[in-house]
Amino acid sequence: MFTLKKPLLVLLFLGTVSLSLCEQERAADDDEGEVIEEEVKRGFMDTAKNVAKNVAVTLIDKLRCKVTGGC
C-alpha cells in the first residue's frame, strides 16, 4: 500500500502544477484578447472617421464647384 501512495502523490502534485500553469496561460491569453479587441475597435473608429472626413471634403468641393461654377 505504501508503494502505491508515493506515485499517486507525485501524480497529484504534477497534475496540480500542470493545472496551475494552464490557468495562468489562459488568463494571459484572455488579457491579450482584450487588448486586441480594443485595437480593433480603435481601428474601426479611425477608419470610420477618415471615411466621414473624405465624404465631407468631397461634398464641400462639389458644392464649391456648383456655387462658383468654375470646375
Curated annotation (Swiss-Prot):
**Signal: present as a keyword of the record?**
yes
Q: Which domain of life is it from?
A: Eukaryota
Question: Keyword set for this entry?
Answer: Amphibian defense peptide, Antibiotic, Antimicrobial, Antioxidant, Cleavage on pair of basic residues, Cytolysis, Disulfide bond, Hemolysis, Secreted, Signal
Give the location in the cell: Secreted
Q: Which GO terms describe its cellular component?
A: extracellular region
**Major subcellular location class:** secreted
Q: What does this protein do?
A: Displays broad-spectrum antibacterial activity against a range of Gram-positive and Gram-negative bacteria. Has low hemolytic activity, low cytotoxicity and low antioxidant activity.
Q: What is this protein called?
A: Palustrin-2AJ1
Which cysteine-cysteine pairs are annotated as disulfide bonds in the entry? C65-C71
Organism for this UniProt entry: Amolops jingdongensis
